[in-house]
Amino acid sequence: MFLKAVVLTLALVAVTGARAEVSADQVATVMWDYFSQLSSNAKEAVEHLQKSELTQQLNALFQDKLGEVNTYAGDLQKKLVPFATELHERLAKDSEKLKEEIRKELEEVRARLLPHANEVSQKIGENVRELQQRLEPYTDQLRTQVNTQTEQLRRQLTPYAQRMERVLRENADSLQTSLRPHADQLKAKIDQNVEELKERLTPYADEFKVKIDQTVEELRRSLAPYAQDAQEKLNHQLEGLAFQMKKNAEELKARISASAEELRQRLAPLAEDMRGNLRGNTEGLQKSLAELGGHLDRHVEEFRLRVEPYGENFNKALVQQMEQLRQKLGPHAGDVEGHLSFLEKDLRDKVNSFFSTFKEKESQDNTLSLPEPEQQREQQQEQQQEQEQEQQQQQEQQQQQEQQREQQQQEQQQEQQQEQVQMLAPLES
């Protein structure tokens, strides 16, 4: 099947943790991996294009979401699949066309830079060295954090194994009651420490992306005087470079996260085994506890050895991409397959635009047509306000009536007093 690599991509998505929603990046990754696995030749890609397979891969992203009552995911899936298959077909057909456009663009840029070939090569070389200087502190920090966090993880987990061995010796008659809380705590501690490890390590990828933007912008300014009227085409090439370099940063983050999840999957069964062995005999449990500390140390050390070189390998990849740019812009450039990065960038931009438009429309629809329970709630509030207004009006009317009655009583009293005065006046005379 063409999609073995895509299946691995979906598995990686599952390993790194399900998100609240299917993201544009996940969809774009599935589509690009599918296209890459078909063929690097556009004609062959069109001939072997099987929409049903791409549809299956996209639907797989929604399986967990549709298990819930999730109207948003269902609507997104209905609109996304036709859009994605159409975009994919157009992608395959436009590949050769884009390749020719990029070739012509490079030829024009090279022609403009040719009289200054030595200066351009020197500027790119200086930029490479500046990039290395920018990244080196962060690479060192990443390596230090890997060592620090793994050592902290080891220190956090090892005492649980030692404590459980001690409890086993002291409470042989009540193993389940005594050891189960410690086994549960070990499981919780594994989850907590792996999450903290990811939170400490993955932000470095974002720092790298900031430095990449700075480096590419400085390179653009340094080459601008030599580009003359080909500046726009040079900028386009630099955009492709920045896209590829930042893609490496995203892949670095994904690899760190995936390695941390793999560590969790290796450590979690150790705690589960302890809980399972509580129902067995004391001798088997004692053997498992004796081996627990060694298993913890080995898995943590394997993680450290695997992740420690990630930063250095990332730096090497960026330097290599800068050198490839120098080769593409040089006078002796060969047939460089540079169009694929632009093709992927275009795909991701279109998928992001689709998601943004869909979410904006969804938000507008929700504003114009509220869900039925919310409509009922608003109607109830309006009715309550009307009732309160009516009650207030009734109270005001009652107050007015009382005031009128009081005024009438006062007037009657005044009239009676005047009549009494008039009746007494003749007697006094």
UniProtKB/Swiss-Prot annotation:
Keyword Mitochondrion part of the UniProt annotation: no
KW Protease (keyword) present: no
PTM comment: Phosphorylation sites are present in the extracellular medium.
GO molecular function, one term: phosphatidylcholine-sterol O-acyltransferase activator activity
Per-repeat ranges for Sequence: 33-54, 60-81, 82-103, 115-136, 137-158, 159-180, 181-202, 203-224, 225-246, 247-268, 269-286, 287-308, 309-330
Biased composition (Low complexity): 381-420
Top-rank lineage group of the source organism: Eukaryota
Pfam family, any one: Apolipoprotein
SUPFAM superfamilies found in the cross-reference section: Apolipoprotein A-I
Subcellular compartments: Secreted
Subunit-structure text: Homodimer.
PANTHER family: APOLIPOPROTEIN, APOLIPOPROTEIN A-IV
General function of this protein: May have a role in chylomicrons and VLDL secretion and catabolism. Required for efficient activation of lipoprotein lipase by ApoC-II; potent activator of LCAT. Apoa-IV is a major component of HDL and chylomicrons.
Protein name: Apolipoprotein A-IV
Provenance organism: Macaca fascicularis (Crab-eating macaque)
Upper classification of the organism: Eukaryota, Metazoa, Chordata, Craniata, Vertebrata
